[in-house]
A protein has these predicted regions:
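Amphipathic, non-transmembrane alpha-helical scaffold segments
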Residues: 2, 10, 56, 60, ...
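Amphipathic alpha-helical packing segments from all-alpha helical-bundle domains
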Residues: 96, 103, 115-142
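Short helix-capping/turn signature of helix-turn-helix
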Residues: 22, 45, 106-114, 124-125
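N-terminal intrinsically disordered/low-complexity leader segments
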Residues: 1-3, 198-199
Length: 199
Protein backbone atom coordinates (compact mmCIF):
# COMPACT_ATOMS: atom_id res chain seq x y z
CA UNK A 1 0.00 0.00 0.00
CA UNK A 2 2.83 2.40 0.92
CA UNK A 3 4.44 1.73 -2.46
CA UNK A 4 1.21 2.59 -4.27
CA UNK A 5 0.91 5.81 -2.27
CA UNK A 6 4.48 6.78 -3.14
CA UNK A 7 3.79 6.06 -6.82
CA UNK A 8 0.62 8.18 -6.67
CA UNK A 9 2.54 11.06 -5.08
CA UNK A 10 5.23 10.89 -7.75
CA UNK A 11 2.73 10.80 -10.62
CA UNK A 12 0.72 13.69 -9.18
CA UNK A 13 3.99 15.59 -8.72
CA UNK A 14 4.97 14.96 -12.32
CA UNK A 15 1.67 16.41 -13.51
CA UNK A 16 2.03 19.49 -11.33
CA UNK A 17 5.72 20.08 -12.06
CA UNK A 18 5.05 19.81 -15.82
CA UNK A 19 2.21 22.30 -15.56
CA UNK A 20 3.42 24.75 -12.91
CA UNK A 21 7.16 24.15 -12.57
CA UNK A 22 8.94 23.29 -9.34
CA UNK A 23 8.46 26.72 -7.73
CA UNK A 24 4.78 26.80 -8.68
CA UNK A 25 4.03 23.45 -7.05
CA UNK A 26 3.34 23.28 -3.32
CA UNK A 27 2.85 20.30 -1.05
CA UNK A 28 -0.54 21.47 0.21
CA UNK A 29 -2.03 21.49 -3.30
CA UNK A 30 -0.25 18.26 -4.16
CA UNK A 31 -1.63 16.47 -1.09
CA UNK A 32 -5.12 17.89 -1.71
CA UNK A 33 -5.10 16.58 -5.27
CA UNK A 34 -4.54 13.10 -3.81
CA UNK A 35 -7.16 13.46 -1.07
CA UNK A 36 -4.40 13.55 1.55
CA UNK A 37 -3.09 15.97 4.14
CA UNK A 38 0.46 17.35 3.98
CA UNK A 39 1.63 15.08 6.79
CA UNK A 40 0.54 12.09 4.67
CA UNK A 41 2.91 13.15 1.90
CA UNK A 42 5.71 13.75 4.41
CA UNK A 43 5.37 10.18 5.64
CA UNK A 44 6.77 9.10 2.28
CA UNK A 45 9.03 11.99 1.29
CA UNK A 46 11.00 14.30 3.58
CA UNK A 47 10.60 17.39 1.38
CA UNK A 48 9.57 18.69 -2.03
CA UNK A 49 13.21 18.35 -3.08
CA UNK A 50 13.10 14.69 -2.04
CA UNK A 51 10.02 14.20 -4.25
CA UNK A 52 11.80 16.01 -7.10
CA UNK A 53 14.87 13.77 -6.98
CA UNK A 54 12.85 10.57 -6.63
CA UNK A 55 10.75 11.63 -9.60
CA UNK A 56 13.81 12.31 -11.77
CA UNK A 57 15.26 8.90 -10.82
CA UNK A 58 12.00 7.19 -11.77
CA UNK A 59 11.62 9.04 -15.05
CA UNK A 60 15.22 8.45 -16.14
CA UNK A 61 14.74 4.70 -15.62
CA UNK A 62 11.37 4.77 -17.43
CA UNK A 63 12.82 6.65 -20.42
CA UNK A 64 15.97 4.53 -20.68
CA UNK A 65 14.05 1.23 -20.61
CA UNK A 66 11.51 2.24 -23.25
CA UNK A 67 13.44 4.58 -25.53
CA UNK A 68 17.10 3.78 -25.02
CA UNK A 69 20.16 5.67 -23.82
CA UNK A 70 23.95 5.54 -24.10
CA UNK A 71 23.72 2.95 -21.31
CA UNK A 72 20.90 1.00 -23.04
CA UNK A 73 21.83 1.11 -26.72
CA UNK A 74 19.34 0.03 -29.38
CA UNK A 75 20.27 -2.83 -31.71
CA UNK A 76 21.87 -2.02 -35.05
CA UNK A 77 19.26 -2.50 -37.80
CA UNK A 78 19.83 -5.11 -40.50
CA UNK A 79 18.19 -3.06 -43.26
CA UNK A 80 17.34 0.52 -44.11
CA UNK A 81 13.62 -0.19 -43.77
CA UNK A 82 14.29 -1.61 -40.31
CA UNK A 83 16.18 1.59 -39.47
CA UNK A 84 13.24 3.70 -40.64
CA UNK A 85 10.82 1.56 -38.61
CA UNK A 86 13.05 1.89 -35.52
CA UNK A 87 13.18 5.67 -35.90
CA UNK A 88 9.42 5.99 -36.29
CA UNK A 89 8.76 3.68 -33.34
CA UNK A 90 11.08 5.75 -31.11
CA UNK A 91 9.57 9.06 -32.22
CA UNK A 92 6.01 7.78 -31.96
CA UNK A 93 6.70 6.66 -28.41
CA UNK A 94 8.28 9.93 -27.33
CA UNK A 95 5.51 12.15 -28.73
CA UNK A 96 2.59 10.03 -27.47
CA UNK A 97 3.68 8.64 -24.09
CA UNK A 98 2.10 10.98 -21.51
CA UNK A 99 4.81 10.43 -18.89
CA UNK A 100 7.59 11.18 -21.38
CA UNK A 101 5.80 14.32 -22.60
CA UNK A 102 5.46 15.56 -19.02
CA UNK A 103 9.06 14.82 -18.03
CA UNK A 104 10.28 16.59 -21.18
CA UNK A 105 8.21 19.64 -20.21
CA UNK A 106 9.59 19.48 -16.66
CA UNK A 107 13.17 19.41 -17.98
CA UNK A 108 12.47 22.31 -20.35
CA UNK A 109 11.06 24.41 -17.50
CA UNK A 110 13.58 23.48 -14.81
CA UNK A 111 16.84 23.28 -16.80
CA UNK A 112 17.62 26.90 -15.90
CA UNK A 113 16.97 26.39 -12.16
CA UNK A 114 18.22 22.93 -11.31
CA UNK A 115 21.65 21.52 -12.16
CA UNK A 116 20.44 17.95 -12.49
CA UNK A 117 17.55 19.00 -14.75
CA UNK A 118 20.06 20.88 -16.92
CA UNK A 119 22.29 17.82 -17.23
CA UNK A 120 19.34 15.55 -18.05
CA UNK A 121 17.97 18.02 -20.61
CA UNK A 122 21.36 18.12 -22.36
CA UNK A 123 21.56 14.33 -22.31
CA UNK A 124 18.01 13.62 -23.50
CA UNK A 125 17.76 16.44 -26.04
CA UNK A 126 21.29 16.31 -27.48
CA UNK A 127 24.26 14.27 -26.28
CA UNK A 128 22.44 11.04 -25.41
CA UNK A 129 20.69 10.96 -28.78
CA UNK A 130 23.96 11.64 -30.58
CA UNK A 131 25.72 8.84 -28.69
CA UNK A 132 22.93 6.34 -29.34
CA UNK A 133 22.80 7.07 -33.05
CA UNK A 134 26.60 7.17 -33.36
CA UNK A 135 26.48 3.53 -32.24
CA UNK A 136 23.66 2.77 -34.70
CA UNK A 137 25.35 4.47 -37.65
CA UNK A 138 28.77 2.92 -36.92
CA UNK A 139 27.10 -0.49 -37.05
CA UNK A 140 25.19 0.34 -40.22
CA UNK A 141 28.39 1.55 -41.92
CA UNK A 142 30.09 -1.70 -40.89
CA UNK A 143 27.19 -3.63 -42.46
CA UNK A 144 27.56 -1.45 -45.58
CA UNK A 145 24.01 -0.18 -45.22
CA UNK A 146 25.40 3.37 -45.22
CA UNK A 147 28.34 4.94 -47.02
CA UNK A 148 31.54 5.25 -45.04
CA UNK A 149 31.42 8.49 -43.07
CA UNK A 150 31.91 9.92 -39.58
CA UNK A 151 29.16 8.19 -37.56
CA UNK A 152 29.14 10.90 -34.89
CA UNK A 153 28.57 13.65 -37.46
CA UNK A 154 25.87 11.54 -39.11
CA UNK A 155 24.20 11.07 -35.72
CA UNK A 156 24.27 14.79 -34.98
CA UNK A 157 22.90 15.66 -38.43
CA UNK A 158 20.15 13.04 -38.09
CA UNK A 159 18.94 13.65 -34.56
CA UNK A 160 18.94 17.47 -34.40
CA UNK A 161 16.04 18.04 -36.84
CA UNK A 162 14.04 15.16 -35.35
CA UNK A 163 14.54 16.53 -31.84
CA UNK A 164 13.32 19.94 -33.04
CA UNK A 165 10.16 18.35 -34.44
CA UNK A 166 9.54 16.53 -31.15
CA UNK A 167 9.71 19.85 -29.30
CA UNK A 168 7.27 21.28 -31.84
CA UNK A 169 4.82 18.53 -30.83
CA UNK A 170 5.16 19.60 -27.19
CA UNK A 171 4.50 23.27 -28.02
CA UNK A 172 1.77 22.64 -30.58
CA UNK A 173 0.24 19.17 -30.06
CA UNK A 174 -2.21 19.74 -32.90
CA UNK A 175 0.78 19.53 -35.29
CA UNK A 176 1.88 16.08 -34.10
CA UNK A 177 0.60 14.15 -37.14
CA UNK A 178 2.21 16.65 -39.50
CA UNK A 179 5.48 16.48 -37.54
CA UNK A 180 5.51 12.67 -37.71
CA UNK A 181 5.11 12.85 -41.49
CA UNK A 182 8.03 15.29 -41.62
CA UNK A 183 10.16 12.93 -39.52
CA UNK A 184 9.41 10.04 -41.87
CA UNK A 185 10.09 12.16 -44.96
CA UNK A 186 13.36 13.41 -43.47
CA UNK A 187 14.41 9.90 -42.48
CA UNK A 188 13.76 8.59 -46.00
CA UNK A 189 15.70 11.52 -47.47
CA UNK A 190 18.61 10.90 -45.09
CA UNK A 191 18.67 7.21 -46.05
CA UNK A 192 18.62 8.07 -49.76
CA UNK A 193 21.56 10.48 -49.39
CA UNK A 194 23.70 8.19 -47.22
CA UNK A 195 22.70 4.73 -48.49
CA UNK A 196 25.58 2.33 -48.91
CA UNK A 197 26.12 -0.43 -51.43
CA UNK A 198 25.21 -3.50 -49.45
CA UNK A 199 24.18 -6.48 -51.61
Amino acid sequence: MARNTKESILMASLEMFSRNGYAGTNIRELSASLGMVKSGVYKHFASKEDIWNALLDKMVAYYDQRFGSPEHLPPVPDSLEEFLAMTMQMVDFTVHDEKIIMIRKVLMIEQFRDERAKELATKHFLTGLTQMFTHVFAGMIEKELLKSDDPEMLAFAYTAPISSLIHLCDREPEKTDEALKQVEAFSRYFIKVHEGEAP
